[in-house]
Amino acid sequence: MEFTSVNKIFEAAFKKNWLRPAISNYQGETLHFRDVARRMEKLHIMFEECGLQKRDKVAICSRNQANWAVSFLATMTYGAVPVPLLHEFKSANIHHLVNHSEAKILFVDEVIWEGLSESEMPDIQAIIQVNTFKILYAADPKI
């Protein structure tokens, strides 16, 4: 097999399977490849607006769900580095790991967000609610 970039492999897979189911929430919503691609595109726009650069880190701290995978894929295809964090970690551990990883963006469940403080993560540019992709915090008020 000829080597190609990961993005080219994903692009071919998404085009080929556009109308097929891709990922599902347990006993819930099923996302088709087209849905995943559109959500990834929206996240790429958000990443750009937040000033995310290639090789920057993006932490993801959420229960297993379809949007966790979308966040991971969007981060990877943008050229950033996904940093998965267990949702069972205590707030202090999440703060420490986000800071230690030098993450610029953090995806979180709303329940996890309730126990966190953006002031404990000074390098974070944005915190995004993983279920809805709503921006919960942005260092730049214009975002």
Report residues per predicted region:
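Structural core segment of the AMP-binding/adenylate-forming
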Residues: 9, 50, 77-143
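A general boundary/transition motif marking the beginning of the first structured unit of a protein
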Residues: 1-2, 104
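Conserved AMP-binding/adenylate-forming core of the ANL superfamily
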Residues: 2, 11, 19-69, 73, ...
